[in-house]
Each structure stands twice: as C-alpha cells, then as structure tokens.
Amino acid sequence: MPRRVLTGRVTSDKMDKTVTVLLDRRIMHPLYKKFIRRSKKYAAHDEENVCQTGDLVRIEECAPISKRKTWSVVSRNGEDLASASSSVSA
C-alpha cells in the first residue's frame, strides 16, 4: 500500500526534531450543501530542525517514531529536504 502524502502549514516548531502541521480541508454539509472547514494537527518528524512556523510542508506517512509521530517531513516550501541538506553542508 502506498504511503499517504499530505500538505499543510507548520504551526509549531518548539520541539526538538518535531513540528506540528495543521491540515485544512473543506467538506460539504450533507443537508445544507454548505462548505465547512475542518482541520487536524499532525506531529511530524523534522530530522534537521529546518522547518519554521508558517512554512508550507509536505509530510509522508512512515513507521511510528514515537507515540504520536507517524509522519515525517518530505519537503519544505516546495524544495525537497534531501537536496536542501546537501546544499547546506556544501
């Protein structure tokens, strides 16, 4: 089964190697046909602590890292973290 990939905005980066990502989605009310905003927060693993509050990130499902963390950050503001880490170290 493929891993799920979601896109959201970082709301907190105060933890070490962890960011909180807020995902907004719109659903239609079944009776009134009005669109309602629903949101959910995910704890995602940020290995190199590069994400900051307000960043747009893509997170990917992974094996459990801790009790709450089963997602890891794949890209930040449109660029992959693997390529960003190699350019920072060079």
From Swiss-Prot:
GO MF annotation terms: rRNA binding; structural constituent of ribosome
GO cellular component: cytosolic small ribosomal subunit
InterPro entries: NA-bd_OB-fold, Ribosomal_uS17, Ribosomal_uS17_bact/chlr
Disulfide bonds listed in the record: none
Coiled coil regions in record: none
Gene Ontology annotations of biological process type: translation
A family per Pfam: Ribosomal_S17
Keywords: Ribonucleoprotein, Ribosomal protein, RNA-binding, rRNA-binding
Domain of life of the source: Bacteria
Sequence similarity: Belongs to the universal ribosomal protein uS17 family.
Known partners and oligomeric status: Part of the 30S ribosomal subunit.
Its biological purpose: One of the primary rRNA binding proteins, it binds specifically to the 5'-end of 16S ribosomal RNA.
Name of the protein this chain belongs to: Small ribosomal subunit protein uS17
Gene name of this polypeptide: rpsQ
